[in-house]
Amino acid sequence: MNSIELPLLDRTAQNSVISTTLNDFSNWSRLSSLWPLLYGTSCCFIEFASLIGSRFDFDRYGLVPRSSPRQADLILTAGTVTMKMAPSLVRLYEQMPEPKYVIAMGACTITGGMFSTDSYSTVRGVDKLIPVDVYLPGCPPKPEAVIDAITKLRKKISREIYEDRIRPQRQRSNRCFTTNHKFHISRSMNTGNYDQGFLYQPASTFTSEIPTETFFKYKSSVSSHELVN
């Protein structure tokens, strides 16, 4: 045996050892197995549904749709979000384990779309409710654009540090909105201490200026049938 060459056993052992960090290994495992929670309310979600078919086959990216937010690490919002649906979306996001990601798909999700021009009940941007990682514009976006958004999210995950992602979420305050679509700073919802209620107004008050109190103000006396439609 040539003394310069390594024995076959040593060469095999060297080729089988991976030198990496725990953070890089965690990022690699997460970007290769994203489990999305699909939150579709309008026509944009039909475009996403085509990804499940054999033509695009999004399973090759490791995406496994989940029906429970506690088993998902990615929520994909598609379609119009109304104020009545806002607490449900925030609740689903809060039930997802860390680290978690959000893709906003379509113009209606990002800005409210054409429905926000003369509607008091449309949320003008889902980023007023939950932090968004990737914005995917379009009306509706093509399936190829959805794949590109997922690819960009995978690249973002591969470069992040877990501690740096968790720390700002725990320290920053959250942007909430009022019933007249004005920004308001409140306690961070990522700590689980966000206010979980609706500040509702009777129908007669929508003809006048609405006070700038927080939209997510807890009122235990308000029942579900009294919420703003």
From Swiss-Prot:
Protein name: NAD(P)H-quinone oxidoreductase subunit K, chloroplastic
Binding-site positions, [4Fe-4S] cluster: 43-44, 108, 139
Primary location group: plastid
Catalysed reaction, written as an equation: a plastoquinone + NADH + (n+1) H(+)(in) = a plastoquinol + NAD(+) + n H(+)(out); a plastoquinone + NADPH + (n+1) H(+)(in) = a plastoquinol + NADP(+) + n H(+)(out)
UniProt KW keywords: 4Fe-4S, Chloroplast, Iron, Iron-sulfur, Membrane, Metal-binding, NAD, NADP, Plastid, Plastoquinone, Quinone, Thylakoid, Translocase, Transport
Role played: NDH shuttles electrons from NAD(P)H:plastoquinone, via FMN and iron-sulfur (Fe-S) centers, to quinones in the photosynthetic chain and possibly in a chloroplast respiratory chain. The immediate electron acceptor for the enzyme in this species is believed to be plastoquinone. Couples the redox reaction to proton translocation, and thus conserves the redox energy in a proton gradient.
Assigned EC number: 7.1.1.-
Localization terms from the record: Plastid, Chloroplast thylakoid membrane
Lineage: Eukaryota, Viridiplantae, Streptophyta, Embryophyta, Tracheophyta
Membrane-topology annotation of the record: Peripheral membrane protein
CC terms in the record's Gene Ontology section: chloroplast thylakoid membrane; respiratory chain complex I
Pfam families the UniProt entry points to: Oxidored_q6 (PF01058)
Quaternary assembly: NDH is composed of at least 16 different subunits, 5 of which are encoded in the nucleus.
GO terms (BP aspect): aerobic respiration; electron transport coupled proton transport; photosynthesis, light reaction
Keyword Iron-sulfur: yes
Cofactor binding notes: Binds 1 [4Fe-4S] cluster.
Cofactor: [4Fe-4S] cluster
Keyword Iron: yes
Disulfide bridge map: none
Single GO term (MF): iron ion binding
Family stated for the protein in its record: Belongs to the complex I 20 kDa subunit family.
